[in-house]
UniProtKB/Swiss-Prot annotation:
Further comment: Although this protein was isolated in a region containing several WAP proteins and was defined as a WAP protein, it does not contain a classical WAP domain.
Keyword vocabulary terms for this entry: Secreted, Signal
Name of this chain's protein: Protein WFDC11
A GO cellular-component term linked to this record: extracellular region
Signal peptide start and end residues: 1-21
C-alpha cells in the first residue's frame, strides 16, 4: 500500500464514523426533570415504563419515579401528596 493512500483511508474512516453516528438531540434543562409519584403504584402501574428521555407513549400520562423505577402514571393519580 502506498503512503499516499493512508491519509485518504483515514479521512474515509473518519467520514464514515461521523456519518453513522448521526446528530444528537439537544434537550432543554427542564425537559428531563422527573416528579415523584406520591402514592403506592400497583404492579400493573409498574409495567408502564417511561422512555429514556422520560416521555410516555400513553395519552394523559406523565413520567414519574417510584420504588419500581420510572413509570408513566395517569395525570392526577399519584401526584397529590397524601
Amino acid at each position: 500500500m502506498k503512503p499516499s493512500w493512508f491519509p485518504c483511508l483515514v479521512f474515509l474512516c473518519m467520514l464514515l464514523l461521523s456519518a453513522l453516528g448521526g446528530r444528537k438531540n439537544k434537550y432543554y434543562p427542564g425537559e428531563l426533570l422527573l416528579e415523584e409519584c406520591w402514592g403506592q403504584p400497583k404492579t400493573n402501574d409498574c409495567v408502564k415504563k417511561c422512555s429514556r428521555t422520560f416521555k410516555c407513549v400513553y395519552r394523559n400520562h406523565t413520567c414519574c419515579w417510584t420504588y419500581c423505577g420510572n413509570i408513566c402514571a395517569e395525570n392526577g393519580k399519584f401526584f397529590e401528596r397524601k
